[in-house]
Amino acid sequence: MTKDLNTLVSELPEIYQTIFGHPEWDGDAARDCNQRLDLITEQYDNLSRALGRPLNVLDLGCAQGFFSLSLASKGATIVGIDFQQENINVCRALAEENPDFAAEFRVGRIEEVIAALEEGEFDLAIGLSVFHHIVHLHGIDEVKRLLSRLADVTQAVILELAVKEEPLYWGVSQPDDPRELIEQCAFYRLIGEFDTHLSPVPRPMYLVSNHRVLINDFNQPFQHWQNQPYAGAGLAHKRSRRYFFGEDYVCKFFYYDMPHGILTAEESQRNKHELHNEIKFLTQPPAGFDAPAVLAHGENAQSGWLVMEKLPGRLLSDMLAAGEEIDREKILGSLLRSLAALEKQGFWHDDVRPWNVMVDARQHARLIDFGSIVTTPQDCSWPTNLVQSFFVFVNELFAENKSWNGFWRSAPVHPFNLPQPWSNWLYAVWQEPVERWNFALLLALFEKKAKLPSAEQQRGATEQWIIAQETVLLELQSRGRNESAGSEALRGQIHTLEQQMAQLQSAQDAFVEKAQQPVEVSHELTWLGENMEQLAALLQTAQAHAQADVQPELPPETAELLQRLEAANREIHHLSNENQQLRQEIEKIHRSRSWRMTKGYRYLGLQIHLLRQYGFVQRCKHFIKRVLRFVFSFMRKHPQVKHTAVNGLHKLGLYQPAYRLYRRMNPLPHSQYQADAQILSQTELQVMHPELLPPEVYEIYLKLTKNK
């Protein structure tokens, strides 16, 4: 079997992974797999413990099967997929060496395997440094679809994703941020970053799921999730916050950094600050405040999370939107008691809104969004006075007019439109000096509101003027927001077109340069041809939207946007025609007989150019490196020749210089997770070659072994 395995390994295009159970090939592996294995094993153990059994694992792009067989040794049932027969041959030979393992290996294409998967067939899927090839072949959208399906039919997916910055042929096909491939999935979390043998650019590793919250100390299924804090929140926080709801828990997952750089530094800091604030408050709640228990929390460079006990009930905002009957007396009473208790301890909630109040079956209200609990008595928005803001909240609770859509709040500040005795209560507060306003006063007057004098009978001209003015202001705000919606939509479409224009201009510049010094048709030209119809459709949509939404008398800003839209249309057609002509010219050149006849001349010219650019010495070094790479590759494929050469170098005393040269040309990968493994590798090297020990230790070693 050893001879057969040697032959199979020598036939590999590349020894990419560590060969399971055969340390003699560790030095030949392109990547050290042990650091990634530690993380993968940790996630396997967490999921296995949560499900209460060994897992069924799918390894996509299994290469030489190191990760598959390592998990099989823990009791997992493995199916490994790779499109190269040579890799599968090695995997099967290694599986035969370990007959107790439940491991099966097949030749196949990842796209076809994912399409044929059934839900529940596998618990865990692994895809390490493989999907960038599919992106290059089929595009970003297709890979997003594949990964969505993979997350749908498994409990968890572990992905190592290549990045655009890597200097390789497929780099230009990759998304600007690898998270673009998985952002459509419910849950994803960065768990590590690793260098590769191809470049010093690290590749991120993500844990992905459409079914579970996967945190090291918390692994539970969720019933549903949303990227809005409440219904109707729109683009609040730019969808950088995700909320997962389990049977008895709620998980808040805040991203500090998002694809496309959509979060500003201030927005990122706000996410981080509010999460830290909520964790701090809930782990040390003030005495007498009924806070949910914290189940787990943590963060990394990209995100932070908090898992807490799920409170019973529904959001007050949802109940109001549905027109349900609510007991305002109980809701306001319980809410005021909570706010007064917080105030007594030196805390205030700066965002008391219907969507931050949970109401249970007994109509008892409880505050949520504990990240908004602060030590400064000031609201997070207009009006900044907390008592005034609470006036607006009470008006929202009684509001019959749902049509207002204000810039900040959509209900009045004054209490004069409220029914009795609620108007009497807030008017009594209104009459107090502002410096006396607090929640203790609100609660005290609330409890005796039935005995307070009528607000309507005390109303004067000033109050009547306030009612009239605030009604007009709210109406104007609503109209302003509605009328600006069309312009906002146009502005977004103009921005998209300008981005497409910039890409077209870059493509044109590249084509002009390539027409002067012809080479093969680039991917930009292909991209242009494939996307012209999409650009034209987008432009027509923008024009239709403009005609439908903009009134005959256009505001100057909207008219300017339409002019820019028309200019963009003309520029796109102009660039399209020029690029089509360039493409035809390049194709004519490549089909010509002279192009084929001058292939050797062009190669010779390239070598002369490189010689002039780098000099004779550098070109000689380059030639020597190519020869040495061929020799090293030949020896890796022929272990017996390698063994003979190593013995000969030892006898001649040249092994260490040769080994250093080999390592210089084939460096081991390094990453922030490799420190322990590097120390271990150095120790093993010293055991094998005592002359590498420190001089004092080596002298003691010689004394101990000289009589043996």
UniProtKB/Swiss-Prot annotation:
Interacts with WbdA. Pathway: Bacterial outer membrane biogenesis; LPS O-antigen biosynthesis. Residues 687-708 are annotated as: Required for localizing WbdA to the membrane. Pfam families: Methyltransf_31, Pkinase. It comes from Escherichia coli. Regulates the length of the LPS O-antigen polysaccharide chain. Stops the polymerization of the chain by phosphorylating and then methylating the phosphate on the terminal sugar. This terminal modification is essential for export of the O-antigen across the inner membrane. WbdD is also required for correct localization of the WbdA mannosyltransferase. Residues 1-210 are annotated as: Methyltransferase. This is O-antigen chain terminator bifunctional methyltransferase/kinase WbdD. GO terms for molecular function: ATP binding; methyltransferase activity; protein kinase activity. Residues 601-669 are annotated as: Required for membrane-binding. It comes from the Bacteria. It is a peripheral membrane protein. It is an enzyme of class 2 (transferase). One of its GO terms (cellular component) is plasma membrane. ATP binds at residues 229, 237, 241-243, 252, 274, 309-311, 358, 369. The gene is wbdD. It catalyses: 3-O-phospho-alpha-D-Man-(1->2)-alpha-D-Man-(1->2)-[alpha-D-Man-(1->3)-alpha-D-Man-(1->3)-alpha-D-Man-(1->2)-alpha-D-Man-(1->2)](n)-alpha-D-Man-(1->3)-alpha-D-Man-(1->3)-alpha-D-Man-(1->3)-alpha-D-GlcNAc-di-trans,octa-cis-undecaprenyl diphosphate + S-adenosyl-L-methionine = 3-O-methylphospho-alpha-D-Man-(1->2)-alpha-D-Man-(1->2)-[alpha-D-Man-(1->3)-alpha-D-Man-(1->3)-alpha-D-Man-(1->2)-alpha-D-Man-(1->2)](n)-alpha-D-Man-(1->3)-alpha-D-Man-(1->3)-alpha-D-Man-(1->3)-alpha-D-GlcNAc-di-trans,octa-cis-undecaprenyl diphosphate + S-adenosyl-L-homocysteine; alpha-D-Man-(1->2)-alpha-D-Man-(1->2)-[alpha-D-Man-(1->3)-alpha-D-Man-(1->3)-alpha-D-Man-(1->2)-alpha-D-Man-(1->2)](n)-alpha-D-Man-(1->3)-alpha-D-Man-(1->3)-alpha-D-Man-(1->3)-alpha-D-GlcNAc-di-trans,octa-cis-undecaprenyl diphosphate + ATP = 3-O-phospho-alpha-D-Man-(1->2)-alpha-D-Man-(1->2)-[alpha-D-Man-(1->3)-alpha-D-Man-(1->3)-alpha-D-Man-(1->2)-alpha-D-Man-(1->2)](n)-alpha-D-Man-(1->3)-alpha-D-Man-(1->3)-alpha-D-Man-(1->3)-alpha-D-GlcNAc-di-trans,octa-cis-undecaprenyl diphosphate + ADP + H(+). Keywords: ATP-binding, Cell inner membrane, Cell membrane, Coiled coil, Kinase, Lipopolysaccharide biosynthesis, Membrane, Methyltransferase, Nucleotide-binding, S-adenosyl-L-methionine, Transferase. InterPro entries: Kinase-like_dom_sf (IPR011009), Methyltranfer_dom (IPR025714), Prot_kinase_dom (IPR000719), SAM-dependent_MTases_sf (IPR029063). Residues 485-594 form a coiled coil. Residues 211-459 are annotated as: Kinase. One of its GO terms (biological process) is methylation. Disulfide bonds: none annotated. S-adenosyl-L-methionine binds at residues 16-17, 36, 61, 82-87, 108-111, 128. The lineage of its organism: Bacteria, Pseudomonadati, Pseudomonadota, Gammaproteobacteria, Enterobacterales. Belongs to the WbdD family.
